[in-house]
């Protein structure tokens, strides 16, 4: 059975604004990140050399991304959907085969904290 976790957060912005803000936020959260010609961002993360690439479709609210570090690789679906005057950001985390259940749970906890910080930053420039 595949182990997954879902992170959901309401953001006090409309979908398009939230989408643009998340895209613009990545290089601010990770100042040493550099984008390569193939669309991959490279940086040193908590688990060593890391890369991330966004596969996006703004009109559909799709902001999926691939993340690879020295310990694991992730395909992360992310959706931004309308919720009245707000937007709902939904992130689905599937346990990579390389990680134990314990390691996955630890990573999910860190990602949840990052998502909480991201929400505060996204809403702070309203």
Question: Where on the chain are the PLM-derived regions?
Answer:
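Hydrophobic ligand-binding cavity/cleft-lining segments
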Residues: 1-37
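A general secondary-structure signal for short beta-strands and their flanking turns/coil
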Residues: 2-4, 60, 73, 86
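Short, surface-exposed coil-to-beta transition loops
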Residues: 4-6, 47-51, 72-77
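A short, structured loop/turn motif at beta-sheet edges
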Residues: 12-16, 55-59, 80-88
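Hydrophobic pocket/interface hotspot
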Residues: 18-22, 54, 89, 118
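Short beta-strand segments that buttress and anchor functional surface loops
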Residues: 40-46, 63-69, 93
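Short, charged/polar surface micro-motifs in flexible loops or helix N-caps
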Residues: 47-50, 56-62, 70-71
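Beta-strand/loop substructures that line and gate deep hydrophobic ligand-binding cavities in soluble
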Residues: 66-126
């Amino acid at each position: 059975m595949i182990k997954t976790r879902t992170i959901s957060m309401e953001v006090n912005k409309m979908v398009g604004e939230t989408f643009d803000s998340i895209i613009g936020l990545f290089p601010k959260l990770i100042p040493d990140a550099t984008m390569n010609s193939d669309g991959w961002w490279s940086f040193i993360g908590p688990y060593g050399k890391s890369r991330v690439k966004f596969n996006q479709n703004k009109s559909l609210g799709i902001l999926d991304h691939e993340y690879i570090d020295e310990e694991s690789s992730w395909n992360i679906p992310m959706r931004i959907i309308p919720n009245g005057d707000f937007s709902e950001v939904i992130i689905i985390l599937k346990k990579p085969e390389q990680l134990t259940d314990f390691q996955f749970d630890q990573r999910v906890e860190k990602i949840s904290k990052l998502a909480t910080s991201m929400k505060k930053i996204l809403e702070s420039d309203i």
